[in-house]
């Protein structure tokens, strides 16, 4: 039976400033930590990425043509405040006004994120969000944007607080490249959630028009053997690190007893102490019912086994399937040998995990109000067919179809899901994979910056027109 999606459903495409804009030092933009980190550690940089800074009219014209009626955009904090605070860069402000005007001209609603992995370098060097001064600077930046850009109706504070702490302090693949420091992971999560809560409260108290929420990456965690208590415990602890800790902060305004028990266990095994003040709890509590929506980024699920050794993570950055290892002291290890398809980057393709995660939010956090799936898509080594000027990305179509089907199921089962944003609108730069891993509806020739609609773009157009998942 063909499933359908609601008439008012957003069929969106997602981007991020650093991954799409290029122009990393153009028109007064300040440096971000990634600029230096990529120069020192990788064979690629974010220059020119997809040159969205100059080519956004092309991408938005394509969006309109192919039925994309929403776009996730992030503002580069360092384009507005090159140092993260202090002097405003007027050319950066002008750019975003022009970008948002073009969105509305093309009938593509902008959903705008304030922070997408790109803290200005000056603040990042000073501890990023581990330094509580950065919370203050972020809230000031948020307030400036709320006042300056009234044309924006949908705001999100942060993109993926979980993977920021994870990437910076656990896996070590984001600057500053620290590994296995659980104290920093949880402190980063917490401090960023305080920053989120303060910005949301400010938005509501200021009477700004529009809606505000946050985007969380929520990979579902399962025990490899549900009858083995060690595997069950490993899945619970891994879920606390990546999901439950930040969801509790968002919607409970505190951390549940089970969450804190898990955090204390992990810190007791690995060393470290979490600094949470009474004022922090008051801030979280004041904002817990004020989020207008939750953005869920979902790509994969993980299966966990009990584990009794030291932490060791091998990150698959090359797309050579089977190159991943992930085991954490006091937590557990991910089992990759499961009967589930996976991508070349060892990401488990499991649409049921998205359904389970949506329904978990509905059940455990009934004050969620509404959900957008703000990222979901398939990273692929796309093969461009020169004679046809396209990509036959049937695997991507199949991936998206499967995930939209479970979204339709979740809606039937009572979840208020209002839209879906494919990652990504066009091919963009990938943080730890460079330019090989492509996700877009539109193929980008990174040499010429020409755009070519893939087969998936035509499929998505029909989906947006008919609302039928075929």
Curated annotation (Swiss-Prot):
Domain of life of the native organism: Bacteria
Keyword annotations of the record: Glycosidase, Hydrolase
rRNA processing listed as a keyword: no
Binding site for D-galactose 6-phosphate: 19, 116, 159-160, 297, 430-431, 437, 439
EC main group: hydrolase
UniProt KW Hydrolase keyword: yes
GO CC terms in record: cytosol
InterPro entries recorded: 6P-beta-galactosidase, Glyco_hydro_1, Glyco_hydro_1_AS, Glyco_hydro_1_N_CS, Glycoside_hydrolase_SF
Active site per the UniProt annotation: 160 (proton donor), 375 (nucleophile)
Catalytic activity: a 6-phospho-beta-D-galactoside + H2O = D-galactose 6-phosphate + an alcohol
One biological process term in Gene Ontology: lactose catabolic process via tagatose-6-phosphate
Biological pathway: Carbohydrate metabolism; lactose degradation; D-galactose 6-phosphate and beta-D-glucose from lactose 6-phosphate: step 1/1
EC number(s) given by UniProt: 3.2.1.85
Pfam families membership: Glyco_hydro_1
SUPFAM superfamilies documented for this protein: (Trans)glycosidases (SSF51445)
Molecular function per GO: 6-phospho-beta-galactosidase activity; beta-glucosidase activity
HAMAP family registered for this protein in UniProt: LacG (MF_01574)
Stated family: Belongs to the glycosyl hydrolase 1 family.
Cited NCBIfam families: lacG, PRK13511.1
Protein name, per record: 6-phospho-beta-galactosidase
Organism listed in the record: Staphylococcus aureus (strain COL)
Lineage per the UniProt record: Bacteria, Bacillati, Bacillota, Bacilli, Bacillales
Gene that this polypeptide is encoded by: lacG
């Amino acid at each position: 039976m063909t499933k359908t999606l609601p008439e008012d459903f957003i069929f969106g495409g997602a981007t991020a400033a650093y991954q799409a804009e290029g122009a990393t030092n153009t028109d007064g933009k300040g440096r971000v930590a990634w600029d230096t980190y990529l120069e020192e550690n990788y064979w690629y940089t974010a220059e020119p990425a997809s040159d969205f800074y100059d080519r956004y009219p092309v991408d938005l014209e394509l969006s309109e043509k192919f039925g994309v009626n929403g776009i996730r955009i992030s503002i580069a904090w360092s384009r507005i405040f090159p140092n993260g605070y202090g002097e405003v860069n007027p050319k950066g402000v002008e750019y975003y006004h022009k970008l948002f005007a073009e969105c509305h001209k093309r009938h593509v609603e902008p959903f705008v994120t304030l922070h997408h992995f790109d803290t200005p370098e000056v603040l990042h060097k000073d501890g990023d969000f581990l330094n509580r001064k950065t919370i203050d600077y972020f809230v000031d930046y948020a307030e400036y944007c709320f006042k300056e850009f009234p044309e924006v109706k949908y705001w999100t504070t942060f993109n993926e607080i979980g993977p920021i702490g994870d990437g910076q302090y656990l896996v070590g693949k984001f600057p500053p490249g620290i590994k296995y420091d659980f104290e920093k992971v949880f402190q980063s999560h917490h401090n960023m959630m305080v920053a989120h809560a303060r910005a949301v409260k400010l938005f509501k108290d200021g009477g700004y028009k529009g809606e505000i929420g946050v985007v969380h990456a929520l990979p579902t965690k399962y025990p490899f053997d549900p009858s083995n208590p060690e595997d069950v415990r490993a899945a619970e602890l891994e879920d606390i690190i990546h999901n439950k800790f930040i969801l509790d902060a968002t919607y409970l305004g505190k951390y549940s007893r089970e969450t804190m028990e898990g955090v204390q266990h992990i810190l007791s095994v690995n060393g470290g102490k979490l600094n949470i003040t009474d004022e922090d709890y008051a801030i979280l509590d004041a904002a817990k019912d004020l989020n207008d929506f939750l953005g869920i980024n979902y790509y994969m699920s993980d299966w966990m086994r009990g584990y009794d050794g030291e932490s060791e993570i091998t990150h698959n950055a090359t797309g050579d399937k089977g190159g991943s290892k992930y085991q954490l002291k006091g937590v557990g290890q991910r089992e990759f040998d499961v009967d589930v398809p996976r991508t070349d980057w060892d990401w488990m393709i499991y649409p049921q995990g998205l359904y389970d995660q949506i329904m978990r939010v509905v059940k455990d956090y009934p004050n969620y109000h509404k959900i957008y799936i703000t990222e979901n898509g398939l990273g692929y080594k796309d093969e461009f067919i020169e004679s046809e000027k396209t990509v036959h990305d049937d695997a991507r179509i199949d991936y998206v179809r499967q995930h939209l089907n479970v979204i339709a199921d979740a809606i039937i089962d009572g979840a208020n899901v209002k839209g879906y944003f494919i990652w990504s609108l066009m091919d963009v730069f990938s943080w730890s994979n460079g330019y090989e891993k492509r996700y877009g509806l539109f193929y980008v020739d990174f040499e010429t910056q020409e755009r070519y609609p893939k087969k998936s773009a035509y499929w998505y157009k029909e989906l947006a027109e008919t609302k039928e998942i075929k």
